[in-house]
């Protein structure tokens, strides 16, 4: 099992219920693939450093995860094709 930090930005024009549904959906993707989410940090809505997909703001979420690479790869694959996530990054934490 490896430790990962996942940061993703949700598009700002979603209401609270829709945003929570996106967060729950992607948390469940990780859990269904055997990942353990150790920490969830909601940074809230922040201004982006530059425009991404015509958005100037985004809702930031940061997850700390312990999992096999398979779970993170599935998260990455689905985050790439989701219209609700405008940017994401997965970083493997050093030992």
Curated annotation (Swiss-Prot):
Keywords: Ribonucleoprotein, Ribosomal protein, RNA-binding, rRNA-binding. The keyword Metal-binding does not apply. The keyword Transmembrane does not apply. It comes from the Bacteria. GO terms for molecular function: small ribosomal subunit rRNA binding; structural constituent of ribosome. GO terms for biological process: translation. It holds the Pfam family Ribosomal_S6. GO terms for cellular component: cytoplasm; ribonucleoprotein complex; ribosome. PROSITE patterns: RIBOSOMAL_S6. Binds together with bS18 to 16S ribosomal RNA. NCBIfam families: S6. Belongs to the bacterial ribosomal protein bS6 family. PANTHER family: MITOCHONDRIAL 28S RIBOSOMAL PROTEIN S6, SMALL RIBOSOMAL SUBUNIT PROTEIN BS6M. This is Small ribosomal subunit protein bS6. The gene is rpsF.
